[in-house]
Regions:
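PRPP-associated nucleotide enzymes
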Residues: 2-132
């Protein structure tokens, strides 16, 4: 998958993992973190990798949680597909001198459910099946 491809390219890198998912309550969406593990991040180059960048809230919430393991020298956010709204949100959250954003494509909109249009669908569900 996306993460394993990065681990093949950056084969000497340490790796962490976060289990994050969206919780929908009517029109409100929040991000739930169930699990996070990683080595110390102090003064390292940190790549936060996810196939989709929709609202940007998963990236922000995950990064804030990772900071409990130290402060990286540089942050790279990597996504295959992003939305214009998600990119704008991350620009508000992070100063440009602290983060580099890498996206293969930026789609123009989010629909009323905050899914990227046209996007890829729910990557987590497509890769692993529906949440239990």
């Amino acid at each position: 998958l996306f993460r394993s491809g990065f681990m093949q390219v950056f084969d000497n890198a340490d790796a962490g993992f976060v289990a994050a998912y969206r919780v929908e309550d009517g029109n409100d969406i929040s991000i739930q973190l169930d699990y996070l593990a990683c080595p110390s991040l102090d003064n390292c180059t940190f790549m936060l990798v996810d196939p989709m960048l929709a609202t940007g809230k998963s990236f922000e919430t995950s990064y804030r949680a990772y900071l409990n393991n130290g402060t990286p020298a540089k942050l790279h956010i990597v996504a295959v597909v992003a939305s214009e709204q998600g990119v704008a949100y991350l620009k508000e959250c992070f100063p440009s001198d602290e983060v580099t954003l890498w996206c293969a494509v930026i789609d123009p909109e989010l629909n009323r459910l905050s899914y990227i249009v046209p996007g890829l669908g729910d990557c987590g569900d497509l890769c692993y099946g529906e949440k239990l």
